C-alpha cells in the first residue's frame, strides 16, 4: 500500500523540474518575440523615412591593406623624377572650374579670379593590384609623389586656400592615373584697351604652363568640357558683364626651350549705366544750361558772364572726375572726346557773349547822325514834308513797323573792321544796307548773334551726338 504513495510522491518530485524547464522555455520565447514586436513598431513609425534610403553593401577594406598599398607604392619611389622620364613626354590633362571673377581693377589693369584647378596624368610607378579601385588621399600625400610644376604666367599674385585645411585633393587609381586639384585665388594681369571707354570690351587671359619642363618633357592638353563656370550672378564684376570664354593652346619659344602654354580668355563687356549717370547726363545738361544765356538780354552783363563762367568751371570739374576711374593713358578715350566737345560748346557760348558785348559796347554812330550833331542848323531845319496817307490802316502799320526797324538798324550800324583781310571777307551792315555789297563777302549782323546761336548751337550739338553714338555703338 505504501508503494503507490512513493511513486506518486516520486512523480511529483520528478515533475517539478520538468515544469520549471517548460516555464523557462516560454519566458525565453516571449523575450525573443518582444524585440521583434518593438522593432516592428519602430519600423512602422519610421517607414516613410527609411523608404527613401538606398542601402549599398560595400566590402569592408581593412585599414592595414591601404597602409600596405601606400607603403609598397612609396618604397623606392623618387618624387624628383617625372613619369616616363627618358621615354616619352608626360601628358597632363587640365581642367578648371571658375568659382568667381572680379572685381576688375582698370587702374592697375588686373582682375581677380577664384578657381578650382585640376591636373590628371599617368604614373606607372603608382600602379597597384587590389580590390580597391581608387585611393582617396588628403594633402599630406601630395609632397610624397611627383607633381607638375605648373605656374600661371600672367599672375601678379596667387594664394592657395589653407582654411581649415589645405584645399588640395589627391586621387590615385589602380592603373596609375593621378588626379590632383587645388583651389587658388589669382590676381592676373589684363591689358585693357581703353580707346572705346566706356563702351569697351575686353578679353582677359589666364595663362599657365610648366615652369621648367619644355614640350619635350611635358605636354598639356585640355579635357573635354575643360572649363566650367559657376552661377555668374554671384560674381563681383560691378561695371562689367560676363559674355563668354574660350580656351587655346599654343607654343611659346624662349631661350630655355619651347613651352606649351594653355590660355583661357574671359570676355567681358563694360556696363555704361554708371558712366551715363555720372558723366554723360551731367555734361549734356551743362551744355544745355549754357544755351540759356542766348535768351538773356545782352545788356545783363553780370547774369550772362556768371552763367558762362559757372558752366565752364563745372565742365572742368566733371572732366577731372571722369578721369579718376581711368589709368593715365596717353591716348584719347571715347569719354575724353565727349567731355572735350562739351567743354568746347560751353566755352564757345561764353566767347559768343564776349564777342557780342564787345561790338555792342563799342559801336559808332552812323554818318548821318554825325553830320547832324556837327551842324546844329541841319538839326533845327530838318523836317519831313507833310504827306497825306490814303492807304489802308494795315499798310500804314506795316510802313510804320518798317520805319521802326530801319531806325533800329541805323542804331546798330557798325563801322567796318580795320584791316584788308577783314574787309575782303566781311562787310558791315551799314555798307551792305546801302548797297555797298561786294562779291565774296559775308553779311553778318552782330546784333543778331544771339538769334544765330539759338539755332546753331543746339543743331551742332545734336549732330555731334548722332555721329558720336552711332560711331561707337554700331561701327
From Swiss-Prot:
Disulfide bonds join 190-204. Residues 41-275, 323-334, 473-475 are extracellular. GO terms for biological process: cellular response to histamine; chloride transmembrane transport; gamma-aminobutyric acid signaling pathway; inhibitory synapse assembly; synaptic transmission, GABAergic. It is a multi-pass membrane protein. The chain crosses the membrane at residues 276-296, 303-322, 335-359, 452-472. It comes from the Eukaryota. One of its GO terms (molecular function) is GABA-gated chloride ion channel activity. Residues 297-302, 360-451 are cytoplasmic. The modification Phosphoserine is found at residue 382. It catalyses: chloride(in) = chloride(out). The extracellular domain contributes to synaptic contact formation. GABAARs subunits share a common topological structure: a peptide sequence made up of a long extracellular N-terminal, four transmembrane domains, intracellular or cytoplasmic domain located between the third and the fourth transmembrane domains. NCBIfam families: LIC. PANTHER family: NEUROTRANSMITTER GATED ION CHANNEL (PTHR18945). Belongs to the ligand-gated ion channel (TC 1.A.9) family. Gamma-aminobutyric acid receptor (TC 1.A.9.5) subfamily. GABRG2 sub-subfamily. This is Gamma-aminobutyric acid receptor subunit gamma-2. It comes from Bos taurus. The lineage of its organism: Eukaryota, Metazoa, Chordata, Craniata, Vertebrata. The gene is GABRG2.
